[in-house]
Amino acid sequence: MAQEIKMVYDTVKQGLSQLKNSAELKSSLPGHLSGRNHLNVVKSIEQLNKDIKELTEAYASVLAKHIAQTESAVNAMKETDENISSSMK
């Protein structure tokens, strides 16, 4: 009934590294469209762009925290595995 769970730490770290790189989102939405245009639609679009930018920044922040927590957990698992392995020898 003993089952072994194997974690390939290098693969996990590589995946986290890729996730970290993709988490560095850069918003390319224009800040101000209006200029001399006074249409309500333009104001609405500018507000939507601002909201999207804020949401993207919040998402990136939360994702960065989750990545850091995952890295910490993986490091703790690796250390535990190494301690157990050395105590079995």
Swiss-Prot record:
InterPro entries in the cross-refs: DUF5344
Pfam family, one: DUF5344
Disruption phenotype: Deletion of the yxiB-yxiC-yxiD-yxxD-yxxE operon has no visible growth phenotype, however it is out-competed by wild-type cells.
Organism taxonomic ancestry: Bacteria, Bacillati, Bacillota, Bacilli, Bacillales
Name of the gene this protein is made from: yxiC
UniProt-recorded name of the protein: Protein YxiC
Lineage top rank: taxon: Bacteria
